[in-house]
Amino acid sequence: CLRLRIMIMELLNKIVKRGQFYLPVFAQQATYLQHASKTLCAMMETMEMPKWRSLEKEVKACEVQGDALLTELHEQLSEKFMTRLKKIDIQAIAMSMDELLDHINDSAKSFHLYSPDRIDPQIADLAQYIHAQADALRQMVSYLGDIKANYAQIALQCERITELEHAADDTYEEYIGFIFNNEKDAIQVIKYKNIAEQLEAATDAAKRVSDNVRKVILKHME
């Protein structure tokens, strides 16, 4: 009887591991997000166009690899029948992470596109918020292997991402007021406003990832 129980537990462990095939995908997406956001922050530390182009290519490489990873996940989902999360939940999390990566890439492209004459502190702050959110996402993903046991840690990182998004909103609104009051050239106003909008949109995208994860963990705690 004991031997049978051990055999059943071993079988269940294999099924669970097989059912968690999506976790390495989430982890890799989080790695791309962290590298891309760190590279975006590095763009704030230089005014050299060649350096911007080089760093933008690094972000783009992460975005391309992220797209390929998402395609691979979709293929795996079509073949898998047993997972600890529902397919729709896995897709929602993965697609929102990919959307965040797209927004980071768009933010990096905006520097190359608009070639700003300066980088205001608020712009650099927005990039730092994105990087901090990416770090929180990486930590959050590492806990998804056992949602019930790690509920508090996951919820904490979700809350951290939300707080960073709120801080980014405040910074964005302050910056828009700043440029309209201090920038006399209408073209420059549009330029800096668009750059700030891209960055703020990325912080919103990070919150959407967090919101999708919140929905999943709440289902598991019902």
Report residues per predicted region.
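N-terminal amphipathic/basic-hydrophobic helices that include classical n-h-c signal peptides
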Residues: 1-7
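Cytosolic, long alpha-helical scaffolding segments
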Residues: 7-222
